[in-house]
Structure formats: C-alpha cells, structure tokens
From Swiss-Prot:
GO terms for biological process: L-proline biosynthetic process. Pyrroline-5-carboxylate reductase; part of the gene cluster that mediates the biosynthesis of UCS1025A, a member of the pyrrolizidinone family that acts as a strong telomerase inhibitor and displays potent antibacterial and antitumor properties. These compounds share a hemiaminal-containing pyrrolizidinone core fused with a gamma-lactone, giving a furopyrrolizidine that is connected to a decalin fragment. The keyword Zinc does not apply. GO terms for molecular function: pyrroline-5-carboxylate reductase activity. Belongs to the pyrroline-5-carboxylate reductase family. This is Pyrroline-5-carboxylate reductase ucsG. Keywords: Amino-acid biosynthesis, NADP, Oxidoreductase, Proline biosynthesis. It comes from the Eukaryota. Pathway: Mycotoxin biosynthesis.
Length: 318
C-alpha cells in the first residue's frame, strides 16, 4: 500500500486537510472532519463553503497507522470523505495539503515543522495549530529559523493558533481562535472558519489571551469531569448504581450548562434551585467550607502559568 490506502470515493473536489500528530486530539479532529462530510448512505446537501477532498493523517509508524485505522472504522465506513495516510514523512504530508492541522505534542513542534524541505512544502498554506502554550511567533521561528521569513520566491505560510478539545470528534468542540493580523489574514480567514466549524463552535480572542483560554476550554474539560466524577462517587456512596449515577450527574451538569448558554448567569441558576435553609443550601455550605471556588480559580491560574512557560521553552528550543 502507498503511504496510505484506505480510501472512500468522493466525486466532489475541494481542499485537502493534513493532520500532523494523531494522538487524542489529532484523532478527534480527524473524526470530526470525516463526520462533517455527507454519509455514504445519504445525498446530504453541502453545509460548508469549502468541501473536503481528502483528509491525510501523518503518522510515525505502521503500528500507529494500524491503531489509528481501528479507532476510525466507524467514520471510514459511514462517511464519503477519502482518508489517506503518510508514514514518517511530515514534509510529504504537508506538501499534499491545502490546510495543515498541527496537533503533535508541543515539545515536538520544532521537529514537525523544521524538517528539510518543509519551508517549500508549507509555502502559502493555512496552518491551524492546536498546540496549547505554543504561540504563532514560536511556530514561525520553527519554520523559518531566526529570520522568520520565507526564502526568496516562497509565499509565507499563514499560521493560526486555535484551541480545540476532544469533543471535536463529535463536532461539539468549543474552538477559540487567535488570528494574528498579517497580509493574508482575510484571504485565509473564511477558509479557517469554515474548516473549524466542522468541529463545533468557533470564537475569537486576541493572541495574548490564548493561555487563559486554553486553561479554560481545553484543560477545563478535565476540571469539569473531575468534579463530575466526585458527584458520581458521592451518589454511589449513598446507594445509587454507578451507571445510573453517571448518567444522571452528566445530564444534570449538561442542564446547568445549557441554562447558562441560554443566557442565565451561573449565580442565578444556583439561586433558582436553592432555598435558604434547604437541602441544596446544606450541600453548598460544604462546598464553601472546602473553598471550591478558590481551588478552581487556582487551577485555572496554575494551568495558564504553565502554558506560558511551555511557550517560552519552545521559543528557546526553536
């Protein structure tokens, strides 16, 4: 088989997407991209401005390829988007792409982008980095060394920093974009948003806020599920079965989140379900005594600080 050979047929031309780094988030992005394409059994209308021609997964080894294919069986079988693979050749994977997702480990960014031939392969292309704590400036430095300029005759790539989460697999990611103003920002902007809408909702912030956004939207998933697990275990200790407790706790959290998404302030939701001296107030008293608010705020702050340190370290290494 040529680098990759698991393909579905599609007659619709469009853009080729390459994903560099097929760990948890990279795999989730591939799943979301494939699921955004029409199902093989349906003649669904095109929902997006830029149809996908092919998704290319860049993997390190044949073992990783086999593992990835197993995790993508449902998407490969159910959707019309062709899926291809490139093994141990990031430059070739980028050369074939119109859009590149950078989803490797942050410490591997320089290795992924600094290979021989990468400047030529990446020239003029949209690069969407989902690396937490690695700024656009650091990635440009990795591609163009100390000059941060493309070689003569080469168009610069356009790097966009975006924070997504693994809900991208279900097209439910909250993706936040910090797009730096460059000469081709507007040219690439509509393509970038169209691609990211395939993974969920898209919002924009200034680049300096990205560490805090990453702590909230990416790491925040783990913080929410840690609290969710604590609620589940509390209910189990009171006699509920774990399956029932898990479902009820998750639905309760989703209901509270939907109320806030609909416009209610979190404090208003709390007040609405709390009667002074009642049973909910008794539980909230315990949470206040444990200083849950302060601990949670400290977790966000600690994560944000760590992300800034990661970027500083990456910048020194590139």
């Amino acid at each position: 088989m040529r680098n990759g050979a698991h393909r579905c047929e599609s007659a619709m031309p469009g853009v080729t997407m390459t994903v560099l780094g097929c760990g948890k988030l990279g795999t989730a992005i591939i799943q979301g991209l494939l699921r955004s394409c029409p199902k093989a059994s349906e003649a669904a209308p095109q929902k997006y401005l830029y149809p996908i021609s092919t998704v290319i997964a860049a993997v390190r080894s044949k073992d990783r390829l086999e593992s990835l294919i197993k995790s993508l069986v449902a998407e490969i079988n159910d959707h019309t988007c062709p899926l291809d693979f490139v093994i141990a050749n990031n430059v070739e994977a980028v050369r074939r792409a119109d859009v590149v997702f950078l989803a490797c480990h942050p410490n591997q960014a320089t290795e992924c982008l600094g290979g021989i031939g990468m400047q030529d392969a990446i020239s003029g292309k949209l690069v969407i980095s989902v690396l937490g704590g690695v700024s656009v400036a650091t990635l440009e430095q990795a591609v163009y060394s100390s000059t941060r300029r493309p070689a003569s005759g080469q168009a610069p790539c356009h790097i966009v920093q975006a924070i997504a989460n693994t809900a991208a697999a279900r097209q439910q990611s909250v993706t936040v974009v910090a797009e730096e103003e460059t000469a081709n920002s507007h040219e690439k902007g509509s393509l970038c948003e169209d691609v990211l809408r395939r993974l969920g909702q898209v919002s924009y912030v200034s680049p300096d806020l990205m560490p805090a956004v990453t702590a909230l939207c990416a790491s925040g998933t783990a913080f929410f599920t840690t609290y969710l697990d604590a609620m589940i275990q509390g209910a189990v200790s009171e006699g509920l079965g774990e399956d029932v407790a898990t479902r009820l706790a998750a639905l309760t959290m989703a209901g509270a989140a939907n109320a806030v998404i609909s416009g209610e302030h979190p404090a208003a939701v709390t007040s609405r379900v709390t009667t002074p001296g009642g049973v909910t107030a008794e539980g909230l008293k315990v949470l206040r005594e444990g200083d849950l608010r302060t601990l949670t705020a400290k977790a966000i702050s600690a994560t944000t600080r760590r992300l800034r340190l990661v970027d500083e370290k990456s910048r020194k290494q590139s």
